[in-house]
Amino acid sequence: MARVTVEDCLEHVDNRFELVMLSTKRARQLATGGKEPRVAWENDKPTVVALREIAEGIVTNEFIAAEEIVTEDPVFAAFEDESNEAV
């Protein structure tokens, strides 16, 4: 298992803050089982796999946007209902 460095990831992402957001979204996709990894899992945690995908240039903001599926989460639906009533 090769180490992933921030510098490897920053070759494909504009800045560290964007890297944090991108890796968080991708790791969450992997952890919840909604998406398949694009690299070998090798007994790593979802965050490491997400960073490896970013370092290899496989996962980008465009990839995440295309892969995101809007789902109705009952927890957030309650907040949306309250905000719609206030208008």
UniProtKB/Swiss-Prot annotation:
One of its GO terms (biological process) is DNA-templated transcription. Transmembrane segments: none annotated. InterPro entries: DNA-dir_RNA_pol_omega, Pol_omega/Rpo6/RPB6, RPB6/omega-like_sf. One of its GO terms (molecular function) is DNA binding. SMART domains: RNA_pol_Rpb6. It catalyses: RNA(n) + a ribonucleoside 5'-triphosphate = RNA(n+1) + diphosphate. Its EC number is 2.7.7.6. It comes from the Bacteria. It holds the Pfam family RNA_pol_Rpb6. GO terms for cellular component: DNA-directed RNA polymerase complex. Keywords: DNA-directed RNA polymerase, Nucleotidyltransferase, Transcription, Transferase. The keyword Nucleotidyltransferase applies. The RNAP catalytic core consists of 2 alpha, 1 beta, 1 beta' and 1 omega subunit. When a sigma factor is associated with the core the holoenzyme is formed, which can initiate transcription. Promotes RNA polymerase assembly. Latches the N- and C-terminal regions of the beta' subunit thereby facilitating its interaction with the beta and alpha subunits. Belongs to the RNA polymerase subunit omega family. This is DNA-directed RNA polymerase subunit omega. It comes from Pseudomonas putida (strain W619). The gene is rpoZ.
